[in-house]
Amino acid sequence: VEAYEALMRVKMPLLNSPLTVMKLAREMDKLYEVERLTAFKATSTFVMMQNRGRLHRNTKLFLNSIASSSLTDEDVAEFKAQFAELLNNLVIEITEEEEIDREALERKRRALGDQGALALDDWGSGYSNSNSLLELSPDYIKVDITIICDIDTDADKQQLVKDIVE
């Protein structure tokens, strides 16, 4: 296994899905809190699993990040201090459920520095398009499932993915 993606799972019946949590967080202006909690909790769980020998040291962690939110400079400093040994394994996934905030994106790039990588998640859905590929210049492109589904029998989908790769 080369990489794992950290996914949000909800244990409360009233908040029955990650989409519900994100909608509520957006309505309550709490996306930053979700961004911070996700980054720290997912990464600390990943480190714990590595320390227990359940994950190889070179395994990458794909960490979902909200396009319009970013950690503060203080958060980034704390994160780097706490997880310095993992930074080269970290891939920040930009999800495009909403339009990308250019300032937030630049803060994410600065936080990564020469370490870590950037991924564009669910390309082909939401706000994602060719412009986002050019603007983000991601290290990884995760193509949306609607494009990948039945790609083995759909020549148009095959050509689309071929064009992205080339």
PLM features: residue spans?
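The catalytic core of metal-dependent phosphodiesterases that act on cyclic dinucleotides
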Residues: 81-151
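Structural detector of well-ordered beta-strand residues that form the stable sheet scaffold
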Residues: 7, 62, 119-121
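Catalytic core of bacterial c-di-GMP phosphodiesterases, primarily the EAL and HD-GYP domains
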Residues: 32-107
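Short, contiguous acidic/charged loop-to-helix segments that flank catalytic cores in large enzymes
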Residues: 25, 151-155
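Cyclic nucleotide signaling catalytic output domains
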Residues: 20, 24, 41-44, 64, ...
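Alpha-helix-loop-beta-strand connector modules within alpha/beta enzyme cores
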Residues: 160-166
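Conserved long alpha-helical elements within nucleotide-processing catalytic cores of c-di-GMP signaling
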Residues: 19-26, 32, 110
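A short, well-structured catalytic beta-strand-centered motif of the EAL phosphodiesterase domain
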Residues: 1-23, 42, 141
